[in-house]
UniProtKB/Swiss-Prot annotation:
Quaternary structure, from the entry: Monomer. Interacts with TIGAR; the interaction increases hexokinase activity in a hypoxia- and HIF1A-dependent manner.
Enzyme Commission numbers on file: 2.7.1.1
Gene of this entry: Hk2
Protein name: Hexokinase-2
GO cellular component terms attached to this protein's record: centrosome; cytosol; mitochondrial outer membrane; mitochondrion; sarcoplasmic reticulum
Swiss-Prot/TrEMBL GO biological process terms: apoptotic mitochondrial changes; canonical glycolysis; carbohydrate phosphorylation; cellular response to leukemia inhibitory factor; establishment of protein localization to mitochondrion; fructose 6-phosphate metabolic process; glucose 6-phosphate metabolic process; glucose metabolic process
UniProt-annotated stretches for the region Hexokinase large subdomain 1: 208-447
Pathway(s) it belongs to: Carbohydrate metabolism; hexose metabolism; Carbohydrate degradation; glycolysis; D-glyceraldehyde 3-phosphate and glycerone phosphate from D-glucose: step 1/4
Free-text comment about domains: The N- and C-terminal halves of the protein contain a hexokinase domain. In contrast to hexokinase-1 and -3 (HK1 and HK3, respectively), both hexokinase domains display catalytic activity. The region connecting the two hexokinase domains is required for the catalytic activity of the N-terminal hexokinase domain. The N-terminal half regulates stability of the whole enzyme.
Organism of this sequence: Mus musculus
Subcellular location: Mitochondrion outer membrane; Cytoplasm, Cytosol
Loss of function: phenotype: Embryonic lethality around E7.5 stage probably caused by the absence of hexokinase activity.
Annotated binding of ATP 2, by residue: 532-537, 680, 747-748, 784-788, 863-867
Family to which the UniProt record says this protein belongs: Belongs to the hexokinase family.
Amino acid sequence: MIASHMIACLFTELNQNQVQKVDQYLYHMRLSDETLLEISRRFRKEMEKGLGATTHPTAAVKMLPTFVRSTPDGTEHGEFLALDLGGTNFRVLRVRVTDNGLQRVEMENQIYAIPEDIMRGSGTQLFDHIAECLANFMDKLQIKEKKLPLGFTFSFPCHQTKLDESFLVSWTKGFKSSGVEGRDVVDLIRKAIQRRGDFDIDIVAVVNDTVGTMMTCGYDDQNCEIGLIVGTGSNACYMEEMRHIDMVEGDEGRMCINMEWGAFGDDGTLNDIRTEFDREIDMGSLNPGKQLFEKMISGMYMGELVRLILVKMAKAELLFQGKLSPELLTTGSFETKDVSDIEDDKDGIQKAYQILVRLGLSPLQEDCVATHRICQIVSTRSASLCAATLAAVLWRIKENKGEERLRSTIGVDGSVYKKHPHFAKRLHKAVRRLVPDCDVRFLRSEDGSGKGAAMVTAVAYRLADQHRARQKTLESLKLSHEQLLEVKRRMKVEMEQGLSKETHEAAPVKMLPTYVCATPDGTEKGDFLALDLGGTNFRVLLVRVRNGKRRGVEMHNKIYSIPQEVMHGTGEELFDHIVQCIADFLEYMGMKGVSLPLGFTFSFPCQQNSLDQSILLKWTKGFKASGCEGEDVVTLLKEAIRRREEFDLDVVAVVNDTVGTMMTCGYEDPHCEVGLIVGTGSNACYMEEMRNVELVDGEEGRMCVNMEWGAFGDNGCLDDLRTVFDVAVDELSLNPGKQRFEKMISGMYLGEIVRNILIDFTKRGLLFRGRISERLKTRGIFETKFLSQIESDCLALLQVRAILRHLGLESTCDDSIIVKEVCTVVARRAAQLCGAGMAAVVDKIRENRGLDNLKVTVGVDGTLYKLHPHFAKVMHETVRDLAPKCDVSFLESEDGSGKGAALITAVACRIREAGQR
C-alpha cells in the first residue's frame, strides 16, 4: 500500500522540492557539457604525456604499449587455449574459431579455484597449480597430445615488453605469491609446464582484460578499435598509430594502448572537479592519492559515494529528519547494486524504501525520492566523466586518421555498464553530444576477456601465417648478390653480341652506333638550334654556348603541340608543321632568316648510319605519319625546309634522348661518358672503343653506343629471374615478348607489377580482407608516381591509405603496410637490376682501357630516378657493390635532351672546325 501511494505521489510539489534541494546540494556533481569538454581536453593532454618518451615517466595516464598490433578481420580460424586469471578463481578455455564463410566461435571452459594458501605462498606453488589445472582441463577434452597456442589474460599491473613477455609490477586483489614481482609471468608458466613434462603449449600472447574486451568485440565488428571496462574498476584501450608511441621502436602500423585511465587526475589535474565526497572516499581507500578518476566512476566506489552523501545530508538535517543509523555509518554498507536497484524505472522508489529500511532508517516518502535523485546524480556523473574521456580517445583516432567523420565501435564490458538500468544510455548520449562528428556504436562483450585472449592469439597466428605466405611470394622478387652478379655477367655477354658484326642481327641488345665520337671539352661556343621530338608535344630551343670566363649555356625554348590529324597524316604534313614551328620560333626570337647548326633529338627507333643520318624503323607513341618509316628523318626535315624557302639550317646531328643526357652532363663534368634514362622507359649509352664497334669502319678513338638495353632478356636469358607477375605484365602489354628488361625496371610497368601482386594477395585472402574491388582489376590505375608517394619516408600510413582510397581501394592500417612493402620490394628490384646493368657498362669501359681502377660519371635523367625516394640510392649501392674497381659518380641532367642535342651539334662543329684548320 505504502509503495503504490509513494509512486502516485512521485511528482507532487513536495517531491519536486526535494529533488531541487538535492540538486542544489550536489550542484558540483552535475557537470555541464562545457565542463565535460574541458575535462576531455585535459585528458587529451594527459594521453600525449603518457605516449611521449620524455614525459612518460611522470605521466599519470601511463598509455602502456600492449604489442597487440591488429584487431580481428573475421578470417581468423583455428583451435586455441585461453587462461583468464584476475581473482581468486580463474578460467581455462578452449576456443574454436571457424571461417568457412560463416564466422563462428565455439567455447568450452572450466573455472578453477585458487586456495588462499597458494595465493599467499610461493610463485612456484601458484604457477604449478595453474599448470595442474590446465593439464586437468586438457585431459578432460582429450587434447593433451596437441601443442595448442595459448592466450593469457593476466589482470594485474604489468610492464609489457613483447606480446608474450610481461613483468609483474605488483600484486593486487589479495595475491601475495612470493618471487613473482619483477618476473616475466609467461616465463613462469612455461617453466611450470616444463616441470610437469606431460603436455606442451605455445604461449603466444599475454593481455589485460580491457584489451581482451576490444578483441572479443573486434571479431564481431571490424570497426571496433576501442575497449572499455566500467565495472568494479574502470579502464580503456584503443588502437594508436605507431608513429606516436615513443616507447616502442618503429613508425609503421598501429598498436593497442592500455591507457590505465583510472589514474587520470593523480597529478592534480582534476582537483577542481573532485568534490568533498571524492576526497573522503580517497582518504578512506587502500591507496590514497591513486586511481582518483577510477574512484569517481567505477562500481567499487559508486555505492560508497551515495552513502557518504546520505550521511552528510542527514547530519545537515536534510534527510531522515536528521537521524543516522549504525548501518548507514558503516563503510561499504550501501553497494553499487543498490544504486542500480533504486534507479530501476519500475519499482525504484519501493527499492529505495526497502534498502533504507535495511540500513536501519525510517524513511519518509521524500527521503526515498531524494535518495533516488542522489543515485541518479552520482551514476550520471560517472557516465558523463566516462563520456568525456572516451570523447578524447575518439577525437584522437579521428585526428590520426585525418577523417572528417569517424565511424568507430567501442567494445564494452563491466557490471556497471551491463547491469545499471540507465548508465549505458546516458554514456551513449553524452558521447554523441561531445563528439557529434563521430558515428559511434557500442558493442557489449558477452564472452569476457578469456575469449579476448584467444582472439589476440588467433590474430597473431593469422598475421604470422599471412606474413609467411606473403614473404614466400615476395622472395621471388628479392635478388641475392650472386644473382645480381649473374645479371651483370649476362649483360656483358649481350653487349658483346650486339657489338659484333657476326652476332649483331640476332642480338636483343642492339648496341647501335650513334656517330657521336666525343664529349664536350669546354671549348665549345656558338648559337645552336635544337629540336626535341618524342611525343605529342615538341620543343624548339635556341642554345647559346659560351666558353672562357663566361663559360656556360643559356637556353630559350618554346613548346609546340602536334595535332592528331598531323600525327596521323602524311610525312610531308608532319615535317612541314615542324618547320612552320621552327619559323615561328626564329621570328619569336627575332632571328628570322638566320642559318644556324641544328641538333635533332628524335626519340623513336632508328638505324643510324652517320651523325646526321637516321632511318626511322617504326613509329611508336601514337604517331602514324605515312611515308616516313624506312626514310632518313634528316632528309625529310631538310626537304621541308627547302619547300618553305624561308631559311636554311645546317642539320649536324640526330640523336636519341639517352645520348642527349650524356652530352648535357658531359658539359658539366668531363668524366661523364655514360648516359642513363630511367623514367617511363629505360635505356643507356656509353663511350665505346672504336675497335669494338664492328658495325662502323675504323679502329681509332671512341664512339657513343646507344645500347637499347630495354630489350635485354628478349632472347630468354632472364627467364629464370622473371616472376609470374613479370610474365602477366608482359603478356598484357602492347608488345608481348619485347623490352623485357625495361618491363622489370621502368616507370611504365612497376605500378602494373605492384597491382598484379596485390591482386594475387587479395585472391589468397592476404590483403583487403580478400575482397577484390573492380578498381583493383583495372589496368594502369597504379601509376608509378603513387609508388614514389607511398614509399616517401615522410608519408604516414594515414596518407598511404588516402592514396589507396583515391584509387578506390578501402584499406586497413595493416593493408597499407603490406602495400608499402610490395612497392618497396618491386622498386628495390628495379633499382638493383638497373645497377647490375650499369655495373656491366662501367666495368666494360674499365676493361676496354686496361685499368685497375676507373673514375667515371654517369649522366642520369628520368622521373623514376629523380622522383622515387629510394631508387637512386639503391642503384648507386648496387653499382658500388658489383663494380668495386670503378669509382662511379652520378650527375642528374637538369635540362633535358634538347640541350644535349645542341651540345652534340656544338662538339661536332668544334671537331669540324678543328679539321678544317
